[in-house]
């Protein structure tokens, strides 16, 4: 017996000790998988830079985006004085693109946030309670899905009136059913799990089960979809502004800038190129970031 105890103690002593900082938490696993994706990391850095620029745009911009006019260089192309050139009114395009990032990004993020908040609530209710709750909410979502998103947004803005605030509301409305269906599907799966039955058996309320057990299980899907939906919302907001239903001149919103550039595209293509490039790169970055988050949060679905 002593020999056995001695051998067991020797084996335990030979085992390497795991230090606290060597324990891999879910966050460490996520970061390890995410940083291996070079495209997603590049997109994340671009998004971080974009957010910083959007926050400090009015301090970074070399000229006033709305009230500066260089009448001696109308429609001139890029130069050392004006990096992105000048538009037909003499305004510095670089300054307007920087400030436009603030407006376009805010419109996209706020619209998706509103849509995600309402859609998540509806999806939880529909998936958990089912019955008439599920039928009512899903039929409303079906009606909203019956219309193309941009047409629905145009109809909402036509009723509410033009302006960036109404654009945010319009884009949020057609984001709601997408989040509702996503969360409903996850809720239907999670509510069948044994840990939900265990929570019910100990007397947990529906609110506790929804907030403490089901909602955390849907967060990863919501985060991924939220990120990718921002790109869609930015395009939608820019499209409405391009049609004259969103931000109004002289507000330097990217879609509104493209609308103003239509008359001068032949003689001064740079007036349209840089706002369009800003929209393209921003949407691409959010989509790549969303793909990276999806693969890092759930590597089983990769490929």
From Swiss-Prot:
PROSITE patterns: ABC_TM1 (PS50928). Residues 101-290 form the ABC transmembrane type-1 domain. Signal peptide: none annotated. Keywords: Cell inner membrane, Cell membrane, Membrane, Transmembrane, Transmembrane helix, Transport. It comes from the Bacteria. One of its GO terms (cellular component) is plasma membrane. It is a multi-pass membrane protein. It is found in: Cell inner membrane. SUPFAM superfamilies: MetI-like. GO terms for molecular function: dipeptide transmembrane transporter activity. Part of the ABC transporter complex GsiABCD involved in glutathione import. Probably responsible for the translocation of the substrate across the membrane. PANTHER family: GLUTATHIONE TRANSPORT SYSTEM PERMEASE PROTEIN GSID (PTHR43386:SF3), OLIGOPEPTIDE TRANSPORT SYSTEM PERMEASE PROTEIN APPC (PTHR43386). The complex is composed of two ATP-binding proteins (GsiA), two transmembrane proteins (GsiC and GsiD) and a solute-binding protein (GsiB). This is Glutathione transport system permease protein GsiD. It comes from Escherichia coli O6:H1 (strain CFT073 / ATCC 700928 / UPEC).
């Amino acid at each position: 017996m002593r020999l056995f105890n001695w051998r067991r103690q020797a084996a335990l002593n030979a085992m390497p000790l795991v230090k606290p900082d060597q324990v891999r938490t879910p966050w460490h696993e996520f970061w390890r998988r995410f940083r291996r994706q070079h495209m997603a990391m590049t997109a994340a850095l671009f998004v971080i830079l974009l957010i910083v620029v959007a926050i400090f745009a009015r301090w970074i911009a070399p000229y006033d985006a709305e009230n500066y006019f260089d009448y001696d260089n109308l429609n001139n192309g890029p130069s050392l004085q004006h990096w992105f050139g000048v538009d037909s009114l003499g305004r510095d395009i670089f300054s307007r693109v920087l400030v436009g990032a603030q407006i376009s990004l805010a419109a996209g993020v706020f619209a998706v946030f509103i849509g995600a908040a309402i859609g998540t609530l509806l999806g939880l209710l529909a998936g958990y309670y089912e019955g008439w709750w599920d039928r009512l909410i899903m039929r409303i979502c079906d009606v909203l899905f019956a219309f193309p998103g941009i047409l629905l947004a145009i109809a909402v803005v036509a009723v509410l009136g033009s302006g960036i605030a109404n654009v945010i509301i319009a884009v949020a409305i057609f984001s709601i059913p997408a989040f509702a269906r996503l969360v409903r599907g996850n809720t239907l799966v999670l509510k069948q799990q044994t840990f939900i039955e265990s929570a019910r058996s100990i007397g947990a309320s529906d609110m506790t089960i929804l907030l403490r057990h089901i909602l955390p299980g849907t967060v990863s899907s919501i985060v991924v979809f939220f990120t990718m939906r921002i790109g869609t919302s930015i395009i939608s907001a820019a499209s409405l502004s391009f049609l004259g239903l969103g931000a109004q001149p002289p507000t330097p919103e990217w879609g509104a800038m493209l609308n103003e550039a239509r008359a001068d595209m032949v003689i001064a293509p740079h007036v349209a190129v840089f706002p369009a490039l800003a929209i393209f790169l921003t949407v691409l970055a959010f989509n790549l970031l969303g793909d990276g988050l999806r693969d890092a949060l759930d590597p089983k679905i990769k490929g």
